[in-house]
Every structure is written in structure tokens, then in C-alpha cells.
């Protein structure tokens, strides 16, 4: 009798785990298939506004005229933990350049958690802690980190996700190319107006 009981338990447990596996697989497939970017290279930055950790405002409008790098993150995300030091290195490289703006925006993570992580990891990137996905979902539906590089006019020129995450050399090259492209457009505009040209 006991052996019959064990056999039945094994049978039903097998069915349970098979069904559980199917359920998990379908959830993963749904997440992957549903996960896409709402904005892509060539699109304009969506209209958003957030408060930074120093109390100042960051918005689409405030980024106009600057080459911008934005990262969406969560401090418990392993890929974000790898990407944030890269963004920190980039931030330190361009901190003195007023033409470049680099910011981090959390996805569903509050001020206390983000501030604690920043302090423990010696990060100085300006950030905005967002308790929800309201701002994040203007850019994407799933997946972090998300890194966007934008021109002075708000056009997104490159986007990186977690597969693979962006490297410092890639981001630095993107920023330099975008700075040079913006300067080229500025020169073209000045020439078309027959005004003295100054390359920034």
C-alpha cells in the first residue's frame, strides 16, 4: 500500500512539475515577445520630467542643446550592476564638458535604496529615483539596463540593452561622434546663414 502511495505521489509530482515548467516557459516567452522598445534610434526622446537627487529638474526640454546619455536601471539587476560603473566612468570623463549630460533613472526603486547603493559603490552620476515605471515605460516595456544616447535636438542616435550591455568604448565613441555631428550641423547652419562659424 505504501509503495502504491509513493508511486502515485511520484506520478502527480511529475505532472505538477511538467505543468509548472510549461507555465514558467510561457511566462518567459510572453515577457520576451512583449518586451520591445517604444523608442528606437532615429526617434525623438519622449516627453518626460523627473526630479533629480539634488532637487533639480531633468526633462526632455532641459536636455535640448546637449548630447545626452540616459540609463534606466535597478540596483538589484546584475546587468545594471555591471553597467553602472561603465556609466560612472563615462560621467567622470565628460563631467567638465557642459555639452554632455549623463543621468541615471531608476525603474521601480525608491530614493532610499538608490542613495544607499550610490554611497556603497562610490557613484556620483546624477540620478532620479522613480518608485514606478511611468517614465521607464515611455521608453520601453521590459528589460534593464536601457541606455540611450541622444543628439542636441533630442534625436536618439543609439540604444543599448542587456544583450549585451554597452561598453565604455562604445558609449564614448557614440558621444564623440554625436558631438562631432552636432558641430557639423551647427557649422552647416551658420554657413547657410552667411554667419561666422564657430565649432563647438
Predicted segments, located by residue:
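Thiol-based oxidoreductase modules, predominantly thioredoxin-like and allied folds used
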Residues: 98-112, 123-132
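Conserved redox-active cysteine motifs that mediate thiol-disulfide chemistry
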Residues: 72-89
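Short, internal strand/loop/helix patches
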Residues: 115-153
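N-terminal "domain-start" segment that seeds a small globular fold
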Residues: 30-60, 191-195, 199
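Thiol-/selenol-based redox modules, centered on thioredoxin-like
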Residues: 149-200
